[in-house]
Every structure is written in C-alpha cells, then in structure tokens.
Amino acid sequence: MITSQIWLRRNKVRMGEAVADLKLINSMAQDALIEFQQATSKPPKPPSARTIPKWLPPPSNWVKANFDGAIFQGNAEAGLGAIIRNDCGLVMAALTQVIPLPISVEIVEVLAARRALIFALELGFDQVILEGDSEIAIRAMNSDDYMAAPFGHLIADIKALAPHFRSLVFCHTRRLGNKVAHRLAREACNFSSSFCSWIEEVPVCTFADYSAEIINST
C-alpha cells in the first residue's frame, strides 16, 4: 500500500497536481489498507442450526400411522411395530407383531408398513399419513417402478389398499421422529403373545417416548 501511495504521488507531481506531504504517506497507506480490507472482507456466516427431527402431528381430521421393524437374529424372528395418532398427538391405537425372519431388513420394514396400513383400515380411518424411517421403503411406495425389488409384491399389496382410503400419503422421517414405533418393534418379542394391540393407550415400555413426542410436537 505504501508503494502504491508513492507511485500515485509521483504521477500527481508529473501532472502538476497538488500532492500530500511525504510524512503523510504512511498514514494514507494505512487508511487505504483498512478501506480495502473492509470492502473485500465478508462477514463470517453464522453456523447453521441443525433441525433435530421430531414427530409432528398430522393435519386436522387426519391420522398418522408410524411403523418400524426390528430383527431378532437369535430367534430367527422379526418384530413389527405401529402406532396411530390423531392431529392432537393422542394415540388411537398401537400394535406389535412377531413374524418369522424375512430375508432382508427392507422386507421387514415393508411388512411393518403394510401391517400399519391394514390396522388403520381395520379401525376405519380414511385420511392417513403412513410414516416410517426406512427411506428405501417409502421411496418404493411413492414410485411406479417397484416390481423389480425383492419386496415389490408387498408394495403392490400396499398400493392395492390405497383406494380404500379417501386420502393416503407415504412419508419418510428420521429415527428420532419415529421413536414410539421403533420401541414397539424392538419390544415385540417381550410380550406374551406374538400379536398385541392397544386401543387409545400404549404399553408401559413406550410411555416415556410417547409422552416426549407429545410434548415436543407442540
């Protein structure tokens, strides 16, 4: 910056223009440097706040059916879990089911989705959001190109149920937004029956997660 100020002063002398005293060159250079830094510097971007996934209630007059699956390798079984809640976050029904172990985790997830949807249909709900944390399963439900998948026939079953509902939406969430269904699936093998259901209540093992999701959804 000092060199540029001297160069500018020399040019002005050649042109016969008024120039600043040589003693001021250093301070003028410092001022120019500060001005340049202010013009070219960008304010640091504030750190982006990461949104923590959480369960959210469905629109008014809808229900949300969350599903999940779990693997019990030691028993060669799998657990299915589902919970249906209204637009206030209150439980309408929940279920667990233990089934023979399928050949893949994805099939377990799709079976859980199908069971949750059948459960909603059995209870007479006609505006349903079917939500789970398996991105593969939800993507297949929202696609027309699914028959090549190992679980394509199960997706076909789910799509065949769609006309029985006035409105049906397939939605993906993260595990943190699917805690109760996940807990139900994990605990399925701990109940006395291979199939259990609850109406307007949840089993004790899920109560902490269920209560937390109600509080966090408001």
Residue ranges and their predicted role:
Residues 1-218:
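Primary recognition of RNase H-like, Mg2+-dependent phosphodiesterase/nuclease domains
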